[in-house]
């Protein structure tokens, strides 16, 4: 778990210290720095002379990202996190020519649901690697659901809110999707293809409905639920704009 984040001379932040917790919600007007906080964390994960270009983000050259008030000083990001009951501290200093890190940010797996996550489709791609991932745009969330649908959960160890619900991965996805949006979901392999078909149902319509025939927000919230339930101990889940396509009532339930 990330406990503290210090940001200096980065974008709108001249200097800021943030205390983070198991669950941290960033809220505010546009251009207030919410995404910049996420980008600062990614800068600690990505390597190279310009850590602002890589797998999780590509936001430009260092001189474009330095705070306009402080000028051309170095960008400094310091991160304190807890893993396996130990506190680790990582600091990175970034200039136009190099990036110097005190130590690498290790041991924490990141699951990132970007604001550009995939939405309503007729079919969704399978992940072709060995261990199925969610993907930063939730590209493979429904393949993950298909693969782990019947995985049994332990109510003592796993995140189970209602022990009367079905104690499988898919059962918990359905529990939360029904609680928030009033739907259930099924992800099925399309034989002899590299694609997954997704069907929704509810109490009024028990047969499968295509994603295009239900509200757009249903698909977006389903991806978030899958990503959240896929997390293991010590994982870091980052969701950008979780409220996309949700009615205010759905936002409140989320």
Short names for language-model regions:
Residues 1-52, 175, 190-254:
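Switch/communication elements of ASCE P-loop NTPase nucleotide-binding domains
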Residues 47-227, 232-233:
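Phosphate-coordinating catalytic segments in nucleotide- and nucleic-acid-processing enzymes
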């Amino acid at each position: 778990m990330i406990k503290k984040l210090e940001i200096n001379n980065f974008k709108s932040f001249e200097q800021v210290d943030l205390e983070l917790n198991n669950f941290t919600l960033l809220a505010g007007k546009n251009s207030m720095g919410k995404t910049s906080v996420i980008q600062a964390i990614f800068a600690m994960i990505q390597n190279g002379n310009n850590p602002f270009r890589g797998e999780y983000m590509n936001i430009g050259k260092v001189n474009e990202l330095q705070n306009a008030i402080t000028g051309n000083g170095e960008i400094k990001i310091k991160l304190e996190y807890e893993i396996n009951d130990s506190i680790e501290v990582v600091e990175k200093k970034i200039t136009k020519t190099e990036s110097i890190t005190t130590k690498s940010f290790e041991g924490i797996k990141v699951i990132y649901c970007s604001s550009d996550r995939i939405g309503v489709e007729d079919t969704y791609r399978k992940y072709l690697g060995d261990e199925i991932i969610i993907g930063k745009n939730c590209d493979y969330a429904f393949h993950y659901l298909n693969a782990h649908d019947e995985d049994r959960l332990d109510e003592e160890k796993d995140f189970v809110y209602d022990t009367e619900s079905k104690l499988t991965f898919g059962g918990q996805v359905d529990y939360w999707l029904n609680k928030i949006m009033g739907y259930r979901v099924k992800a099925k392999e399309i034989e002899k293809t590299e694609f997954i078909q997704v069907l929704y149902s509810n109490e009024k319509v028990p047969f499968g409905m295509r994603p295009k025939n239900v509200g757009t927000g249903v698909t977006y919230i389903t991806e978030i639920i899958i990503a959240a339930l896929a997390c293991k101990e010590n994982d870091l889940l980052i969701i950008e704009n979780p409220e996309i396509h949700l009615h205010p009532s759905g936002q409140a339930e989320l």
